[in-house]
Amino acid sequence: MLKAKGYKTGIFGKWHLGHHPEFLPNNHGFDEFKGIPYSNDMWPVDYDGRQVPSDHRLAKAYPQLPFFQNFEVVKEIKTLEDQGQLTTELTEAAVDFIERNKENPFFLYVPHPMPHTPIAVSDKFKGKSEQGLYGDVIMEIDWSVGQIMKKLKEHQLHENTLFIFTSDNGPWLNFGNHAGSALPLREGKGTAWEGGQREPCVIYYPNGIEGGRIIETPIMAIDLLPTIAEITDAELPKNKIDGKSVLKILTGEDHQSPQEAY
């Protein structure tokens, strides 16, 4: 969609749509891909970091976690220490992508594997949050956001860049201190309660959206694609799109959700 408008496109993080070549990002609109093809818990390792025996269900279901650069597996993620390098490595790739494309319109997608379990953090953030391992992981993601924004500001791109920070679901409460919390909302991932479905969403776009506001009108993640299409004047794909543009809600021109059900 955006490539047709001359955008350079990159994804650095979790693709989550499979590892076979026909399903990889480079065959679905992205110029560059660096990251893992599915969730970081899809590997033959238990949550405590131990390799499972060959007859374990995880060993039967998954190989070592592959790390891709475009179509090539460049390494395998085998340990929690390996996982702990992902946030920084993907952030550095994202910042480099901005640097190389600062003269072009670009679309950058950074779906970090963390804080999905199993969680891990780089050495530079271990123990820094004083909120345990989960706090350290969130602190490193916060650093990642800052690095990306810093690079945008370095090249005076931040005011004309649509910056979206959000999540896909609530905390996986089964994992206790490794899961986070949705309080004061009820429950978490895998439930229909608000703690599982209602997520933070921060949108920053100085040239198009007035800042400093809290928008109460509900929107959905599937609304982001048509919203981006409207902002960039791009043509939506011909296949059915369930999302609706919420640009008028973001600009304050409308306060009515375009969706009938959530």
Residue ranges: model-predicted function:
Residues 1-262:
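Formylglycine-dependent sulfatase
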